[in-house]
């Protein structure tokens, strides 16, 4: 039987390599929303085997590093999980263990985020019709690229 003690979830998948001020603004936004409805924010961090994120000096930014930094930023206000395959797939799979919940996918307004999350929403609406899914993009005040930061490290 599927159960949940938390009817509102804010799921945020991404690489977060490294976590930066734009990520901080976005995640903080979803934390403030979750506090209004006693919800829970879960961040899914990618753990790529092929598309490894190198710094400009040749170092590697790992999923464990990103997880640790996000936990330092947000403490117990956010649950951070490292994804085995893909953070988006983990968002798909998340619905397998809950029932009658409201799931909001957090994303930014940059790149292809909105298009990707429309696909997720269609998937959930077909496979889990009892779960209310919405996509709530957040436009960060500070447009920044994790790639640019990596190249400076």
Where are these regions (language model features)?
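Nucleotidyltransferase catalytic core that binds NTPs
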Residues: 1-153
């Amino acid at each position: 039987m599927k159960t949940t003690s938390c009817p509102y979830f804010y799921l945020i998948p991404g690489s977060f390599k490294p976590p930066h001020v734009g990520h901080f603004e976005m995640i903080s936004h979803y934390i403030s929303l979750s506090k209004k409805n006693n919800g829970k924010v879960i961040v899914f961090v990618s753990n790529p085997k092929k598309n490894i994120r190198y710094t400009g000096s040749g170092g590697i930014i790992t999923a464990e590093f990103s997880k640790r930094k996000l936990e330092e930023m947000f403490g117990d206000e956010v649950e951070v999980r490292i994804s085995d395959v893909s953070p988006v797939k983990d968002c798909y799979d998340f619905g397998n263990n809950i029932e009658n919940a409201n799931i909001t996918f957090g994303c930014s307004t940059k790149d292809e985020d909105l298009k990707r999350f429309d696909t997720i929403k269609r998937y959930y609406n077909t496979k889990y019709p009892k779960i209310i899914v919405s996509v709530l993009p957040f436009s960060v005040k500070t447009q920044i690229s994790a790639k640019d930061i990596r190249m400076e490290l």
